UniProtKB/Swiss-Prot annotation:
Native species: Arabidopsis thaliana (Mouse-ear cress)
Chain ranges of the Protein kinase domain: 570-843
Transmembrane segments: 511-531
Protein name: Probable LRR receptor-like serine/threonine-protein kinase At1g05700
Classification via Pfam families: LRR_1, LRR_4, Malectin_like, Pkinase
Compartments reported by the entry: Membrane
Protein family: Belongs to the protein kinase superfamily. Ser/Thr protein kinase family.
Residues the record lists as Phosphoserine modifications: S697, S727
Active site positions, chain numbering: D693
SUPFAM superfamilies given in the database record: L domain-like (SSF52058), Protein kinase-like (PK-like) (SSF56112)
InterPro entries noted in UniProt: Kinase-like_dom_sf, Leu-rich_rpt, Leu-rich_rpt_4, LRR_dom_sf, Malectin-like_Carb-bd_dom, Prot_kinase_dom, Protein_kinase_ATP_BS, Ser/Thr_kinase_AS
Length: 852
């Protein structure tokens, strides 16, 4: 009876253990299993492994889904392709967090999904380090890359880099948590690249993986020709082994047929920097207690040097030997039977990894979290994927970072100019504690300038121009600015108080609104009286009542009389220029220099252009667009009064009508100013506006050679739901006019971009738009393309009058922007935000490069 009870307890314990193992085997809490390219939100359970796969839609922001018609394995039937961007990234956030070890596996099958019959080649990155290069030799080949990785942060970035040798893609991405024992698969650099993993037995049967292997390691059957398989039907335990080997793998072993022969294996190593990490797994599968006088004992050696002597595997228990040989051209492993052994050596399983340097730390965690938060809160539409600062060739657009081999990279500069930011200035900026330059200009930011910006002790440039910020500026920022050690740019924020004195004490807060109310009432009464006097005077100034434009009733702009215009221009004494609309005169209004555009009576299109320009200028306000001061319309006399630009227009400068030749830096700044004005028309106006007459003569310069886009006589609004054509009336200036508008009989924002591309080419070359000879007419774009094709040297197209104090790479960048803008394929033309970013980067390059 006692014997029966004992057996019952044994079987009960064994059954309970089996239940525990089964539950653990089914636990996928440490798994992230992604079938790339399947429909968003979808998932399924694999019939063979029982692994739950999900769509990649919540792990990646870019790419397009593609499918392969004929493939057996379900995880290879779909893929995600990345035709755009130099780097695209998946973000994995395992629940176990950072400082843990994970097995990460990426799989690829080309399957000629794109019909190109190509051999795509691209780079694979993990965090800020190169993982491997993926090369698909044909459509049916399957490539799998695997790494054991010690995570540095909560987020794990797996990225694909475009090498220009085919479109990157990925079929499957898998992550497996390897338990809490970080001594398992230990590596000095935090990463082990998979080389091979063998289940040493006969070649019959399939690879072993989950749920037989709790970590979903894939074990490939392998047998040496001089060996045979031995096995057991009993389970092999790994209770005291942190590698948690599969019982199915460990229940088979390989042993030499010739019992006196050793087991040998050789690794060829052509790279002296490569270090192999070898894991040999042993378990005795024969019950030697049933074989009297039989023993199994052997030595383990590397290149003839014994590293483990007299080793005897334990029956049905896993033992692992970790071997880390010195790097040599040939590494020979041997399992040699000892003299007292009666049985040959055995080995059950083998893993080989390569230890490579993952020496580059990720971007400082606080910095990375800050810009990631900004990306989310402002919905930043930039190619911001993966680690912000790494690898260096893939740094996030608009960022600069500092690099130190001993510490993680830090973000030192952030340019979010013209990025469509709205709302308040985010507190996340306060976490960029090493930031030196911050540009938030040309956005829609509102509210106060927060005090925390003054606490960023390394900040030396802060640009907040052209937003809608209100309130007073923190006194510390103003004080730092006054010392000259800090550049603070606050222009074009009408509601912003920039004087220290405007920060009043609390005792005055109740007085100010009361005084302001009385003052406002007084001003209102005064203006009413002035308005009545002006109206009576205007009614008497001409015999017939003036035809007041309907726009004057709806827009709060000053309507002048023709008599006022005669006075301010000194009876039209100084002509500034002439055009199809009429003549522009110089004048003064309240000691302010103005330009008066008088519409010609003979201009057939004049009144339409006049009305269009007034409609545009009374509703758009931007630092890079000419500002309307007023207008007049009496009888046949009509015109505009706008701010005077002292340095004329860009066309005259390029034509050599001024003594000073503009430098490349000045031209870049002018191009950027004009681009920002055009970007505002396209992206900042509701509804958007197409200019339709972008040219160098419509880019005006002030005394500091800062530019504003002018002449909106041909401008038209267009609606976002039907932007393909704005107007069926083709208008503009030959040479700048998009040739495709005659095919489509319409103009749109891409037509403006074509014109701006021509402007850029003029600025680069100093050439006229069209060069005419007796035999032909050559457009500047055709000339540039011809020269670059024949010489591939951008210096051959640069304006010879310009000083050679420039970075040739920035010129190349602008040439590329210009040529893409004038592309005959409209879809290849960039939009204005892209052009603005490109010009901004070029200007920053010029300003930071002091050693030409």
């Amino acid at each position: 009876m006692e014997e029966f009870r004992f057996l019952y307890l044994i079987y009960s314990a064994a059954f309970a253990l089996c239940l525990v193992v089964s539950v653990l085997a089914q636990d996928q809490s440490g798994f992230i299993s992604i079938d790339c390219g399947i429909p968003s939100g979808s998932s399924y359970k694999d019939d063979t492994t029982g692994i739950n796969y999900v769509s990649d839609s919540s792990f990646v922001e870019t790419g397009v889904s593609k499918s392969i018609p004929f493939t057996a394995q379900r995880q290879l039937q779909n893929l995600r392709s990345f035709p755009e961007g130099s780097r695209n990234c998946y973000t994995l956030i395992p629940i176990q967090g950072k400082g843990k070890k994970y097995l990460i596996r990426a799989s690829f099958m080309y399957g000629n999904y794109d019909g190109e019959n190509g051999s795509p080649e691209f780079d694979l990155f993990l965090g800020g380090n190169i993982w491997d290069t993926v090369l698909l030799s044909n459509g049916s080949s399957i490539v799998s890359k695997e790494v054991v990785y010690l995570s540095q942060s909560e987020n794990i970035f797996v990225c694909l880099g475009n090498k220009g040798k085919g479109t990157p893609f990925i079929s499957t991405l898998e992550l497996r948590f390897l338990g809490n024992d970080n001594t398992t698969y230990d590596s000095p650099n935090g990463a082990l690249f998979f080389s091979r993993r063998w289940d040493l037995r006969s070649l019959m049967g399939s690879p072993v993986r989950y749920d037989d292997d709790v970590y979903d390691r894939i074990w490939i059957p392998r047998n040496f020709g001089y060996c045979r398989e031995i096995n057991t039907s009993l389970p092999v335990t790994s209770d005291n082994n942190s590698y948690s080997l599969s019982s199915l793998v460990m229940s088979t072993a390989m042993t030499p047929i010739n019992t006196t022969r050793p087991i040998t294996m050789t690794l060829e190593n052509s790279d002296p920097n490569v270090r192999y990490f070898v894991y040999m797994h042993f378990a005795e599968v024969e019950d030697l207690s049933l074989k009297p006088n039989q023993t199994r004992e052997f030595d383990i050696s590397i290149n003839g040097v014994t590293v483990a002597a007299g080793f005897s595997p334990k029956y049905l228990q896993t033992n692992t030997f970790f071997l880390n040989p010195e790097s040599q051209s040939k590494i020979a492993f041997s399992l040699v039977r000892t003299p007292k052994s009666t049985l040959p050596p055995i080995v059950n399983a083998l893993e080989i990894y390569v230890a490579n340097s993952f020496s580059q730390s990720l971007t400082n965690q606080e910095d990375g979290d800050a810009v990631t938060s900004l990306k989310t809160s402002y919905k930043v539409k930039k190619n911001w994927h993966g680690d912000p600062c790494l690898p260096n060739d893939y740094i996030w657009e608009g960022l600069n970072c500092s690099y130190d081999s001993l510490t993680p990279p830090r973000i030192t500069s952030l340019n979010l100019s013209s990025s469509g930011l709205t709302g308040h200035i985010s507190s996340s900026f306060s976490n960029l504690t090493m930031i030196q330059e911050l540009d938030l200009s040309n956005n829609g930011l509102t509210g106060d300038i927060p005090e925390f910006l003054s606490k960023l002790k390394f900040l030396r440039v802060l640009n907040l121009e052209n937003n809608t910020l209100t309130g007073s500026v923190p006194s510390e920022l103003l004080e730092r600015s006054n010392t000259g050690s800090f550049s603070l740019r606050l222009g074009e924020n009408p509601g912003l108080c920039t004087e220290i004195s405007c920060r009043k004490s609390n005792s005055k807060k109740l007085v100010i609104p009361l005084v302001a109310s009385f003052a406002a009432l007084f001003i209102l009464l005064l203006l009413s009286g002035v308005f009545w006097r002006i109206r009576n005077r205007r009614n008497k100034s001409v015999n017939s009542a003036p035809q007041t434009s309907p726009m004057a009733k709806s827009e709060n702009k000053l309507l002048f009389t023709f008599a006022d215009v005669i006075k301010m221009t000194n009876n039209f004494g100084q002509v500034l220029g002439k055009g199809g609309f009429g003549t522009v005169y110089h004048g003064f209004y309240d000691n302010l220099q103005v330009a008066v555009k008088l519409l010609s009576e003979t201009s057939a299109q004049g009144f339409k252009e006049f009305r269009s320009e007034v409609e545009v200028l009374v509703r758009v306000h931007h630092v890079n667009l000419t500002a309307l001061i007023g207008y007049f319309h009496e009888g046949d006399q009509m015109g505009l009064i706008y701010e005077f630009m002292a340095n004329g227009n860009m066309a005259d400068h390029l034509a050599g009508k001024y003594q000073h030749t503009l430098s490349w830096r000045q031209r870049l700044q002018i191009a950027l100013d004009a681009a920002q004005g055009l970007e505002y028309l396209h992206c900042g106006c509701k509804p958007p506006i197409v200019h339709r007459d972008v040219k160098t003569s419509n880019i005006l310069l002030n005394e500091k050679n800062r530019a504003k886009l002018a002449d909106f006589g041909l401008s038209r609004s267009f609606h976002t739901e039907s932007r393909s054509h704005v107007s069926t009336l083709v208008a503009g200036t030959p040479g700048y006019l998009d040739p495709l508008c005659f095919e489509t009989n319409g103009l749109n924002e891409k037509s403006d971009i074509y014109s701006f591309g021509v402007v850029l080419l003029e600025m680069i070359t100093g050439k006229t738009v069209i060069k005419e000879s007796q035999t032909k007419r050559v457009h500047v774009s055709d000339w540039v393309i011809s020269i670059l094709r024949s010489t591939n040297d951008v210096n051959n197209v640069i304006d010879s009058k310009m000083a050679k104090d420039f970075d040739v790479n920035s010129v190349w960048k602008v040439v590329e922007l210009a040529l893409s803008s004038v592309s005959q394929n409209v879809s290849d033309r960039p939009n204005m935000p892209h052009i603005v970013r490109g010009l901004n980067e070029c200007l920053q390059r010029e300003e930071s490069n002091k050693n030409y």
